[in-house]
Amino acid sequence: MTEHEAIVKQLQAVQNASRKIVPLNEETINGLLVELADRIPAAADAILEANRKDLERMDPADPRYDRLLLNEARLNSIATDLRNVAALPSPLHRVLEERTLPNGLELKKVSVPLGVIGIIYESRPNVTFDVFALCLKSGNATVLKGGSDAAYSNIAIVNLIQTVIRDRGLDPDMIYLLPAEREAAHILLNAVGYIDVIIPRGSQALIDFARKHSTVPVIETGAGIVHTYFDQSGDLAMGRDIVFNAKTRRPSVCNALDTLIVHESRIDDLPVLVVPLEEKNVQIFADEPAYYKLLGRYPDELLEMASPEHFGTEFLSLKMSIKTVGSLEEALNHIARHSSKHSEAIIASDQTTIDAFMKQVDAAAVYANTSTAFTDGAQFGLGAEIGISTQKLHARGPMALKELCSYKWLVTGQGQVRTA
């Protein structure tokens, strides 16, 4: 049997396992997740040793290093997250809509699982736990394609998950970790009939790869080219704090600030807006007006003149660009040209300007006078998320349990037949 044939055979097993999840009651699903959380401490040494092998192959200066890193504190946090998912209300079998037709037919629209969800992701072994928990809670089976840089970690984690599933008398094929090789991704992306949807989580390059090569439906998540516009009516102290938070809180995540847009009438305030970033060694790529305003007031080694490509980059690190504009319209045009439609923000006190920005910006989350760091399922009160959808079909914004479900119509009659 070739590797391709072996993978397809395993995908068939996952599809079969997905049908066994549907009749499981809520107590069974929640009990599995809680036991998995309880078993993490005993498995920690094996998981951390596997993670150490992955880390040894990566330069600590690589922006992906922090995302790859697991430690005791992060494992404890993962266990807490698993318990939190278990405590969430089930999204399954909810009556979303119901009506009785004039002919007496009774219709109910009820929530159901998507089926088998394929996840492609990079450098984040915690995602392995997160995705399994969310997929199981929403009644879905999971096929994972992690990056080769997290191969050892992912194997150790999936081994633990499958052990817990097996120990509870359930089918361990409800989760499957594909080989780390790139060819496995191509098989997954074209597994029509076995995979119901693909969700890529990672860089824009990864998302583009999935969209280009997949014959399975794809929900795009993750990539964020995030802007914050400081308007001529913006409060300076508020702007300083928001910019600092949006850029430095967690620079490697998709809701981190990439480009600060500043109204030219506030160019003299630019040093106050960004000087606090110096303490975090944030590198700034500034257009000409911003560059000369910051020259001598921001460290020379952290300040460069921007080139065009800096305004379409998701930095995922302690880097950002600055663009000056002469009007709200110019700011909106810049965002429309470069945005990935993830998260965009305005800092302003003029309500007319705020309303125009909120109405005209096309993004999954649009903010006024707050940090884009809040684009997160838990922060939105939705519970854990599987990603941030940047498209408009099926789901948009944080994809929590409800977004991992579809629906079907249940139609009950008393012998009616259609005559027209």
Curated annotation (Swiss-Prot):
Record localization: Cytoplasm
Gene Ontology MF terms: glutamate-5-semialdehyde dehydrogenase activity; NADP binding
Top-tier EC class: oxidoreductase
Biochemical pathway: Amino-acid biosynthesis; L-proline biosynthesis; L-glutamate 5-semialdehyde from L-glutamate: step 2/2
CDD domains: ALDH_F18-19_ProA-GPR
GO biological process: L-proline biosynthetic process
Keyword Cytoplasm in record: yes
Catalytic activities: L-glutamate 5-semialdehyde + phosphate + NADP(+) = L-glutamyl 5-phosphate + NADPH + H(+)
Domain of life: Bacteria
EC number: 1.2.1.41
Keywords (A to Z) from UniProt: Amino-acid biosynthesis, Cytoplasm, NADP, Oxidoreductase, Proline biosynthesis
Major subcellular location class: cytoplasm
GO cellular component: cytoplasm
Record-linked InterPro entries: Ald_DH/histidinol_DH (IPR016161), Ald_DH_C (IPR016163), Ald_DH_N (IPR016162), Aldehyde_DH_dom (IPR015590), G-glutamylP_reductase_CS (IPR020593), Glu-5-SA_DH (IPR012134), GPR_dom (IPR000965)
Pfam families for the chain: Aldedh
Biological function: Catalyzes the NADPH-dependent reduction of L-glutamate 5-phosphate into L-glutamate 5-semialdehyde and phosphate. The product spontaneously undergoes cyclization to form 1-pyrroline-5-carboxylate.
PANTHER family: DELTA-1-PYRROLINE-5-CARBOXYLATE SYNTHASE, GLUTAMATE SEMIALDEHYDE DEHYDROGENASE
Family: Belongs to the gamma-glutamyl phosphate reductase family.
HAMAP family found in the cross-reference section: ProA
Protein's name in the database: Gamma-glutamyl phosphate reductase
Lineage: Bacteria, Pseudomonadati, Chlorobiota, Chlorobiia, Chlorobiales
